[in-house]
Amino acid sequence: MTEFDTEQDSGVTYLTREVAAADYIVRYRAPVRFLECCKVCPSFGRTYKCPPITGERNIDFSPFTTARIIVAKIPIPPRTPVSEASSILNPIRLKLEKNLLDMERQTAGSRAFCCTATDGCDFCSGTACARLSEEPCRHPELVRPSLEAYGFDLSATLSDLFCLEMLWGKDGYLPSYLVLIGAVFQ
């Protein structure tokens, strides 16, 4: 059985696993494969949280020695419509992202990878992301792309490291649980 830390908060289960960064990168990163998956998303290239990752947002992963992967497992009541996914996920995502950024700030040279935003980036509330007009990000201190934006396989991460399956909605309803996955590389 896989060893990881577990914590509960308001029905959400938080699971944490620390692994060797080099091993995680070799086993779970396939940027070309996942870039193709990301291209079908309507947010692709429209926010600084999404790929393609270019310029200063490119990361050299070689200096990192550990990767702390954090999963928020969110129970979903039966027959919850898919249309409610954002309203369920966003408050938990924002809390998890704040914690990831706090962890990043505590250790020099570390880097947080936040969760995929279901509605794109939400730091420019009310205005379009600066990426659309080819301007620099307005909130570089807050915006961190997700693991999948850098080509990490989250389904395999979830299965191999946390013994959980990535579930998908069916017939217009959400599955029995949803997950958010973030990380801090140090």
Please identify what each model-predicted range represents.
Residues 1:
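Non-catalytic, low-structured ubiquitin/UBL-interacting segments
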Residues 4, 13-186:
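Catalytic cores of enzyme domains
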Residues 7:
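N-terminal donor/sugar-recognition subdomains of glycan-related enzymes
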